[in-house]
Amino acid sequence: MKEGIHPDYREVLFIDVSNDFKFVTRSTIQTRETAEFEGKTYPLAKIEVSSESHPFYTGQQKIMDTAGRVEKFRNKFGSRATGKVAAK
């Protein structure tokens, strides 16, 4: 393998922002932030969904609205978004 052409493969702290679940794994992701976890400082990567919050793994259906998308949709379309097909 050539020297200097491969990304740095290192331990990275991932934080699921929907439920504050943290885990460390190895990755080549480039981050600017760092965080301390279990007494050690790691590069920090924030993620919206992990195995701790995804409905497939948790067995629970829940709305994960991190950016106000549901409210924005309801404000834009209101009662028109009832799912009923309009008669022609």
From Swiss-Prot:
UniProt GO cellular component terms: ribonucleoprotein complex; ribosome
Signal peptide boundaries: none
Any one of the GO BP annotations: translation
Record InterPro entries: Ribosomal_bL28/bL31-like_sf, Ribosomal_bL31, Ribosomal_bL31_B, Ribosomal_bL31_sf
MF annotations from Gene Ontology: structural constituent of ribosome
Cited NCBIfam families: L31, PRK01678.1
Family as reported in the entry's similarity comment: Belongs to the bacterial ribosomal protein bL31 family. Type B subfamily.
Subunit structure of this chain's protein: Part of the 50S ribosomal subunit.
Protein name: Large ribosomal subunit protein bL31B
Native species: Paraburkholderia xenovorans (strain LB400)
Name of the gene this protein is made from: rpmE2
